């Protein structure tokens, strides 16, 4: 394993000074690059968990892979939600026995035709749950019917339908299984650091500090649970936009009547992997020092009053409550509805003799 990095700290003299007023800037930046270059095969196997998704455990894989960093995230690639079910996919017309573009009622299915043909701007891979080759062409079975997409693991052979999640079939065999798992990013940030400014006017001071993190990924397990529609847990308002009928284009899969069937729409994928970039306004502190000449007569050298507001704001595109999460050992960073940092107010007095 190899670690490379650097850290830079900057603190300026007053960048400007006008009478009693002055300002000082400070900043620190750091980068740490981690990679696994080689590892004993037995040790590597002992650290990696096998793919064992039985339709109910919503398993998060813990893996170390040569060439990637510790804290890597592994799962399936989310391609969207199937717009049409298999029987409504517009490929087969039972009246003619040909692969024409008609729906079950015999009406020309122009939407399915467009999706199947791969018109510009349309994702053909989530049109209907049928297998496609590397060129995006439909794969047919020996009877001339489109090969259906299935989740195939152990004794499970679940056939995906309209409204189910479309996962990337890497090897184009029509089966979603452990062979389709891929590297989805690292929980380690590419950069992190902080900066602030200290303003002084006479005996008054105003200090600020910001910290940031860039380039890390988080598994939003809280969102996974609140959008899974698989048990009696409270659900997010996002499920109101779930798939309900053929032809509906949405990013939220359908609701299913059984927990196991619903779980295949909640496999760990980059649907739930989010950027953890953030900028936090860490604190704002106002301070005032009493006149040292007057304090000396009373036997004091220093008396200083401070008042601070901590954790004022966080700017982030992360959809969870707080993007500031840490990883442990080689595990990926997971947000399982962790209580976010609270905003606090503090006051203090520093007395010197």
Please annotate each region the language model reported.
Residues 6, 16-183, 310:
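Conserved small-residue
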Residues 100, 108, 122-126, 132-140, ...:
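Extracytoplasmic gating/loop element in the C-terminal half of outer-membrane beta-barrel translocons
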Residues 20, 34-56, 215-241, 315-324:
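Outer-membrane beta-barrel and related beta-rich outer-membrane complex signature
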């Amino acid at each position: 394993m190899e670690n490379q990095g650097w850290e830079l700290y900057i603190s300026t003299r007053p960048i400007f000074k006008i009478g009693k007023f002055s300002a000082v800037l400070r900043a620190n930046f750091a980068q740490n690059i981690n990679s696994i270059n080689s590892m004993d095969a037995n040790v590597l196997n002992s650290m990696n968990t096998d793919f064992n998704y039985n339709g109910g455990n919503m398993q998060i894989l813990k893996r170390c892979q040569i060439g990637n960093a510790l804290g890597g995230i592994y799962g399936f690639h989310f391609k969207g939600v199937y717009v049409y079910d298999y029987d409504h996919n517009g490929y087969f017309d039972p009246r003619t026995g040909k692969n024409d573009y008609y729906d079950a009622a015999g009406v020309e299915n122009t939407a399915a035709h467009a999706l199947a043909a791969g018109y510009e701007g349309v994702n053909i891979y989530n049109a209907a749950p049928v297998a496609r080759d590397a060129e995006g062409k439909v794969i047919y079975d020996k009877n001339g019917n489109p090969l259906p997409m299935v989740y195939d693991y152990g004794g499970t052979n679940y056939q995906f339908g309209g409204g189910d999640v479309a996962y990337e079939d890497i090897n184009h065999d029509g089966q979603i299984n452990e062979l389709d798992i891929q590297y989805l990013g690292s929980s380690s940030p590419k950069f992190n650091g902080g900066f602030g400014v200290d303003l002084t006017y006479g005996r008054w001071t105003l200090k600020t500090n910001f910290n940031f993190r860039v380039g890390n990924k988080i598994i939003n397990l809280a969102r996974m649970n609140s959008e899974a529609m698989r048990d009696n847990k409270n659900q997010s308002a996002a499920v109101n936009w779930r798939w309900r009928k053929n032809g509906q284009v949405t990013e939220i899969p359908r609701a299913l009547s059984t927990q196991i069937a619903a779980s295949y729409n909640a496999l760990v994928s980059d649907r739930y992997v989010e950027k953890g970039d953030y900028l936090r306004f860490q604190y704002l502190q106002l301070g005032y020092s009493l006149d040292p000449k007057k304090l000396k007569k009373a036997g004091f050298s220093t008396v200083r009053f401070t008042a601070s507001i901590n954790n004022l704001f966080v700017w982030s595109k992360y959809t969870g409550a707080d993007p500031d999460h840490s990883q442990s050992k080689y595990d990926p960073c997971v947000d399982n509805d962790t209580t976010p940092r609270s905003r606090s107010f503090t006051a203090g007095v520093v007395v010197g003799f």
